[in-house]
Amino acid sequence: MSARTVVILAVLGIALPGPTPIQAQQTPATNPLDAVPDKMPFDIPYGTPISLERAEAAIAATVAEAKKHDWKLNVAVVDSGGNLVAFQRMDGAQLASIQISEHKARTAVTFRRETKVFENAIQQSNFHYVMTLDGVIASRGGIPLVQGGRLIGAIGCSGGTGSQDEVACKVGAATIK
């Protein structure tokens, strides 16, 4: 029986016994969430919380990068427990981005990964369940601060585009070694 005949019979409401050729050709898609990795992803141990001095140095580097491009950003640094250590609002930075910069930093430290990972999960992989996780902001610009293989805090930037926020924050994160 041809596929055209099956479609005509289906439109007329005539049921056929057993699977139709159209049904037989479809195979269920594999769920990428069913994959079991050998190692725990983003398994970065927490370290001693970042000091105020180092947080301010990371912010200074971030602000210097933003100024090169005339980007007006809010920059927040949190410690390994997600507590605010330092913050700077550049002149003219939008007010809504104050909380967003802190949220990006907290997400990066809490989940031990860049916030871009969540953005990619939603936009590129259709992992919409990410939006149900408490405390997640799925927008780039939150970068973990890792020293000696240990997570000591995170930096978050907001006020520009996601890519601008990310570029500036990575400059600040690079001050931590």
Predicted regions and their residues:
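Sec/Tat signal peptide C-region and signal peptidase I cleavage site
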Residues: 19-24
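N-terminal secretory signal peptides that target proteins for export/translocation
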Residues: 1-3
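Bacterial N-terminal signal peptides
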Residues: 6-18
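Flexible, solvent-exposed loop/hinge segments and secondary-structure transition points
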Residues: 25-177
